[in-house]
């Protein structure tokens, strides 16, 4: 009977639906402080969304965060990705490092699950032809190039040494830095390599010292950059020290200690908050500290925006089905904490800005925003 059918249909329609969003980052290992910062950004976004009483396709939606640890290790990263696919997440925010993001992106692509990385900057990530890959930061071609030109034009670097940690991120940003230096007419006098687990840099630094560089660039993360700076001091290498976003953290202040110096370290972070967004970012940082009990370390605002952008696409599509909301994500225009967010046809953020920083009196100080 019609009544029986109506009852059966009503029985199938859940009063509200639970939607799972995945997050992956290094929650253990030497850069766990950055992974946990990212995870906190995701937690805050999910909490905000659940307070907002969102309805999609006529049902109230409750969002759940499924968080995985990739230990900044590519193998662990692909295992975490598979776990999230098996858990039926509708989207993933992550990973933090390019070296984990790139191999995992194939798994999400095969499963048709949208992935937004808050922080993977290696250009290759969005050059694989996957429809599911997005990022909310400028890539290394922009970041490394800007730093390379800055080393020559502003810091007046005549002889520049380059070290990288051989990861997808570190090597990628160092390669782009070298291109930037050469484009500005500068000279790279030495190129050395380490790993992202190394603690002793004496032999490569001794080799570099012989070349008398006035600028040393390091492609890698703060956990290696800090001790490297201290060992440069021990060897009396008085060069300026430069790096990408991986070293551009609050943690570097502790890790480098006295070797940080004043206006000695120069780094850039993808993203740059200009004009009207400055207040928005300041408010976010204050609220983050209150809610999460810690200062923003680096990428938590990007993670927060990535979650919000993903859910905005679901709202526009009136569906949490990845197949249905993915086309909306590709053409989204969203006003985030970090600024306006829209993607090009590869999934790179359009018009990404950069901020250059230095450190003075044990504090990080913004020098300028480059658009």
Predicted regions and their residues:
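Extracytoplasmic ligand/sensor domains, especially the bilobed periplasmic-binding protein
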Residues: 89-192, 240-266
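Short, low-complexity disordered leader/linker segments with a strong preference
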Residues: 1-20, 56-57, 86, 370-371
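Beta-alpha junction/loop-to-helix N-cap segments that form part of ligand/metal-binding clefts
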Residues: 14, 33-37, 52-127, 136, ...
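Extracellular/periplasmic periplasmic-binding protein-like sensory domains
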Residues: 229-304, 360, 364-370
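Segments of small-molecule ligand-sensing domains
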Residues: 287-300, 309-366
